[in-house]
Amino acid sequence: MVYHWRGDLGSWRLLLLLLLLAAWKVGSGQLHYSVPEEAKHGTFVGRIAQDLGLELAELVPRLFRVASKRHRDLLEVNLQNGILFVNSRIDREELCGRSAECSIHLEVIVDRPLQVFHVDVEVKDVNDNPPVFRVKEQKLFVSESRMPDSRFPLEGASDADVGANSVLTYRLSFHDYFMLDVNSKNDENKLVELVLRKSLDREDAPAHDLFLTATDGGKPELTGTVQLLVTVLDVNDNAPNFEQSEYEVRIFENADNGTTVIKLNASDRDEGANGAISYSFNSLVETMVIDHFSIDRNTGEIVIRGNLDFEQENFYKIRIDATDKGHPPMAGHCTVLVRILDKNDNVPEIALTSLSLPVREDAQFGTVIALISVNDLDSGANGQVTCSLMPHVPFKLVSTFKNYYSLVLDSALDRESVSAYELVVTARDGGSPSLWATASLSVEVADVNDNAPAFAQPEYTVFVKENNPPGCHIFTVSARDADAQENALVSYSLVERRVGERSLSSYVSVHTESGKVYALQPLDHEELELLQFQVSARDAGVPPLGSNVTLQVFVLDENDNAPALLEPRVGGTGGSASELVPRSVGAGHVVAKVRAVDADSGYNAWLSYELQPAASSPRIPFRVGLYTGEISTTRVLDEADSPRHRLLVLVKDHGEPALTATATVLVSLVESGQAPKASSRQSAGVVGPEAALVDVNVYLIIAICAVSSLLVLTLLLYTALRCSALPTEGGCRAGKPTLVCSSAVGSWSYSQQQSQRVCSGEGPPKTDLMAFSPCLPPDLGSVDVGEERDLNVDHGLKPRQPNPDWRYSASLRAGMHSSVHLEEAGILRAGPGGPDQQWPTVSSATPEPEAGEVSPPVGAGVNSNSWTFKYGPGNPKQSGPGELPDKFIIPGSPAIISIRQEPANSQIDKSDFITFGKKEETKKKKKKKKGNKTQEKKEKGNSTTDNSDQ
C-alpha cells in the first residue's frame, strides 16, 4: 500500500525540524556496542557506519578514522563495509580488573565537514577463570582436648571474574568429625569455617584428610579444590629438666671438625612420647654458633663443625633447648659457655701503601718506591714479624719503625734491559713452628728517551717502473725504537736535497707516521735512472733522537718510446725516400737501408724490421733485413717486374706492448745506363755529408792503429826498463794491467794509456790500462799480466778464471746462445745534429746486480754501426765527445767492460779511440797489410758504407 503525503507549509517545516534533530543526534550522539572478552580476531561488533548514518562510499573520502587514547589496537573498522570488528585479544580482567563495568571508549572522526562520534563498546565477562586457593593444602593442628562445635577458620578461594561468574559456593567432603559452615555477609566476603562435630581421639585417628571444593556461578561452572590436613595433638603437662642451668668449656682453636665440646643430659617425668626428649639450639642463638657447632638431637652431644679462630671469636654463648615429644611439646633450657684458647695459626699480613710507580729508569739511588707494613694477629712471640726482600734486584728494604719498612732503589735501572720487576716481600713470625707470608709487588720502570730509532739496515734498494701514477706507494721504511710510549713514537721525514734543478720533495714524499714512501710524479727512466735520498726517523721524546736511512730508487725502463726514423734517407712516420735501382742487379743487392732509433733501453730498444705486403703487387722482389733494416733484392730483376714499387717497412721494438713506426721507400727500376745519372742527382745533397763521415772514419782507423802500435812498443820498453832497474825505496811499482778480451764474434782494438801516480809506499798503484785482444777464446774473461812480463799474451796458455769486474746480465746470458749474426743487428741513435756514434746501452752498470739488467743479447738490436751508452743510475748524464764511458758492451760478447776515466781536470788524449769493427773487416785489414791494394780499396769501400750507416 502506498501512502501519499499531503500537507501545508507548516507540516513541511515540522518535518524538516525533525530531520535536523535526528541528524544532530547522529552527529553528536553516542553508540553502544557489546562484545564478549576473549573474542577471536575478526569478531563482529557492529555496523558502525550504518549506525552513524554514513554511506560506505564516503568513508574514505571523508577520512573516516577511529581515535582512542588507550587500547586503540583492540578494535578496528573495515572501511570497505563499515563494520567494527575485534582486532586483537581482549582480556576483561587485564583491561578493567574486578570492576563491575568495563567498556572501551572510541572516538570516530570524519572530515568534510568535521564530525566527532563517541562509541562505547562494553566488554562482557566470560567465565574463563576458575576459583583458585592460595595454597594447595591447608594444615590444621587440633588438640585432642578440644570440645565439639569448636570452629577453625579456613582460607577461602578467589575468582578473577565478576558478577555471577565470581559468586562462589563451598562444599566439604563428607567426614565423621568435621563439617563446613559458610557465613555469607555478601558475595565477596564469605567466612568459611571448619566445625568439630565430636571429640577427637588421637590414639584412634592422629590425622584427618579432607577436601574443600569451591564452585563459581558461571555457565559452565568452574571449580577449585584444596586439601585440608588435620593433625590431632596429644596433651603434655611435664617439661624436660637439665642437671644445671649453665656449663663452661675451654678448647683450643683450630680443633678438628667433629671434636666433642660437651655432652648434655636432660630428664622428663612424663611417659611415652611425652617423655622422649630431643636437643636443639635455641631459636635465638646467633648464626656464628650454628656455623661452628652442631648438636645431636637424640644424645645432646655438641661437636665442632667449623674452624674455630681465636683471632675472630674467642668466646661463644650457646643456649640449648631440650624438648619432649608431647602435644603440645614442652621444653627445658640451659646455657653452654665455650672459651677458645690461642695457637700460632695466623700468618703475618703484609700491606703495601704509598706506592710511587712507575719508577723512572734514571731515578737516583735511595728513591723511595713504596711503604710496607706487616702485622700478625697472634700474640707474644707468635706476633713478632721480620721482613725481607728477594735477592738480586736493584731494591732493598729499610726499616723505619716497628713493623714498617721502606722499599728504596739500590742500583741503576735500565728499562730496555728489564722493563718491570716482580718483587717478592717475605714476612716471618717468631712462633714455633714459624709461619711466613709473601707479597708480590710489580715495579714498572718508566721509560726515558735514551735510544734513537734504528733501521734494520743502513741502505735499501728499491726498483720502480717508470711512468708510475702520481702518489703511488714505492716503499715503506720502518725504524724501531727500543724506548716506550712517546719515546718510541717514530715520525719519518725526508732529508731534503737538490736533485738536479729540482728539490727532492718534488719527486718523493714520506708519510710521517707509517713511513710509506710515495712517488709524487711519474718517473722517467730516460731522464732519471737512480734517485738516491735519505729518510730521517725521529722519535717524540724530549729531547728527540733520530737516525737516517738511505734509499736507492732505481727507475726501471718501460716501453714508452716508439721507434723514430732517421733522416735523410727515410723521413719520419709518414715520410718517404726514393731509390733508383738498375734492373741488371742480382739477388742480394742492397737497395736502401731504413734506419731508426728508440729512446728506450734493453729489449724495449731492440728493433726489428718487417716488410709490409702490398695488395697491388703481391710479388715484390725485395726483402728487408730483420735487424739491419737493409732492403735488398730477393732475385734477379726482369722486365715483368713493375717499374715502381712502394715499400712499407714496419719498424717494431721488442717491448710489451711493442711500439712501431712505418717507413715508406719508393723504389724505381731503371735501365743500367740511367742508374748512375739518377743516382748521382739524387745523392748530390745526401751522400755528401756521409762521404765526409766515411773519410773521417778512415782517418780514425789509421790513427788508432798507429797509436796502438806506438803504445805497445812503449809498454814493452817500459817493462824492460822496470825489470832491469833496481827497486828503490818509496818508489811506485806498476800495477797489474788486466787484459780483457772480446769473444770470437767481434773484436776491439784501442789505445792503451798507462797512468802513474805518486805514492808513499802504502801499496802498489792501480793502473788504468785495459787491452782487448781479438785472438783469445771467447770464454777467457781476463788474463793477469805479471809486473815484469811483456804484454804479449801467449795464446797457448791455459785459460784463467774470468775477471770479477765482468758482470753478465740476465739478458746477455740469454744472448750468448742466440744465433743472430752481428751483421744483422743495428741500432742508430740520433743526436741533436743528426746520426752520431754513441756507446752501447749498459743497464747493468748500476751499483747492484739487481738494478734491472735489461741489456739485449748478442745481436739483439745492438748494431755495430750504432752504439748507445747510458751511465748507471749513479751518474745520469751522457758522455760528451771524446769521453770514455765507465762500462760498455762488446758486440758479439756478453761481457761488460769497465774503463777507468781520467780525472775531470786531466787532458784527454785525442788519439785514444775505440774502433768497432766486424769479424770480416778484421780479416780484410790483415790482407791490406800484405799489400793487396785492390783488396784495400774494396775494404775501404765497405768500411765507408758501414761508417756511413752510423
Curated annotation (Swiss-Prot):
<feature type="repeat" description="PXXP 3">
    <location>
        <begin position="832"/>
        <end position="835"/>
    </location>
</feature>
<feature type="repeat" description="PXXP 5">
    <location>
        <begin position="891"/>
        <end position="894"/>
    </location>
</feature>
<keyword id="KW-1133">Transmembrane helix</keyword>
<feature type="domain" description="Cadherin 4">
    <location>
        <begin position="351"/>
        <end position="455"/>
    </location>
</feature>
<feature type="region of interest" description="5 X 4 AA repeats of P-X-X-P">
    <location>
        <begin position="774"/>
        <end position="894"/>
    </location>
</feature>
<keyword id="KW-0106">Calcium</keyword>
<dbReference type="Pfam" id="PF15974">
    <property type="entry name" value="Cadherin_tail"/>
</dbReference>
<keyword id="KW-0812">Transmembrane</keyword>
<feature type="repeat" description="PXXP 1">
    <location>
        <begin position="774"/>
        <end position="777"/>
    </location>
</feature>
<feature type="repeat" description="PXXP 4">
    <location>
        <begin position="873"/>
        <end position="876"/>
    </location>
</feature>
<dbReference type="InterPro" id="IPR013164">
    <property type="entry name" value="Cadherin_N"/>
</dbReference>
<feature type="compositionally biased region" description="Basic and acidic residues">
    <location>
        <begin position="909"/>
        <end position="923"/>
    </location>
</feature>
<feature type="domain" description="Cadherin 1">
    <location>
        <begin position="30"/>
        <end position="133"/>
    </location>
</feature>
<dbReference type="InterPro" id="IPR015919">
    <property type="entry name" value="Cadherin-like_sf"/>
</dbReference>
<dbReference type="InterPro" id="IPR031904">
    <property type="entry name" value="Cadherin_CBD"/>
</dbReference>
<dbReference type="Pfam" id="PF00028">
    <property type="entry name" value="Cadherin"/>
</dbReference>
<dbReference type="GO" id="GO:0007156">
    <property type="term" value="P:homophilic cell adhesion via plasma membrane adhesion molecules"/>
</dbReference>
<feature type="glycosylation site" description="N-linked (GlcNAc...) asparagine">
    <location>
        <position position="257"/>
    </location>
</feature>
<feature type="transmembrane region" description="Helical">
    <location>
        <begin position="698"/>
        <end position="718"/>
    </location>
</feature>
<feature type="domain" description="Cadherin 3">
    <location>
        <begin position="243"/>
        <end position="350"/>
    </location>
</feature>
<keyword id="KW-0472">Membrane</keyword>
<feature type="signal peptide">
    <location>
        <begin position="1"/>
        <end position="29"/>
    </location>
</feature>
<dbReference type="GO" id="GO:0005886">
    <property type="term" value="C:plasma membrane"/>
</dbReference>
<feature type="glycosylation site" description="N-linked (GlcNAc...) asparagine">
    <location>
        <position position="265"/>
    </location>
</feature>
<keyword id="KW-0325">Glycoprotein</keyword>
<keyword id="KW-0130">Cell adhesion</keyword>
<feature type="domain" description="Cadherin 6">
    <location>
        <begin position="581"/>
        <end position="678"/>
    </location>
</feature>
<feature type="topological domain" description="Extracellular">
    <location>
        <begin position="30"/>
        <end position="697"/>
    </location>
</feature>
<dbReference type="GO" id="GO:0007399">
    <property type="term" value="P:nervous system development"/>
</dbReference>
<feature type="topological domain" description="Cytoplasmic">
    <location>
        <begin position="719"/>
        <end position="950"/>
    </location>
</feature>
<feature type="repeat" description="PXXP 2">
    <location>
        <begin position="799"/>
        <end position="802"/>
    </location>
</feature>
<feature type="region of interest" description="Disordered">
    <location>
        <begin position="831"/>
        <end position="950"/>
    </location>
</feature>
<dbReference type="InterPro" id="IPR002126">
    <property type="entry name" value="Cadherin-like_dom"/>
</dbReference>
<dbReference type="InterPro" id="IPR020894">
    <property type="entry name" value="Cadherin_CS"/>
</dbReference>
<dbReference type="GO" id="GO:0005509">
    <property type="term" value="F:calcium ion binding"/>
</dbReference>
<dbReference type="InterPro" id="IPR050174">
    <property type="entry name" value="Protocadherin/Cadherin-CA"/>
</dbReference>
<keyword id="KW-0732">Signal</keyword>
<protein>
    <recommendedName>
        <fullName>Protocadherin alpha-8</fullName>
    </recommendedName>
</protein>
<feature type="glycosylation site" description="N-linked (GlcNAc...) asparagine">
    <location>
        <position position="548"/>
    </location>
</feature>
<feature type="domain" description="Cadherin 5">
    <location>
        <begin position="456"/>
        <end position="565"/>
    </location>
</feature>
<comment type="function">
    <text>Potential calcium-dependent cell-adhesion protein. May be involved in the establishment and maintenance of specific neuronal connections in the brain.</text>
</comment>
<dbReference type="Pfam" id="PF08266">
    <property type="entry name" value="Cadherin_2"/>
</dbReference>
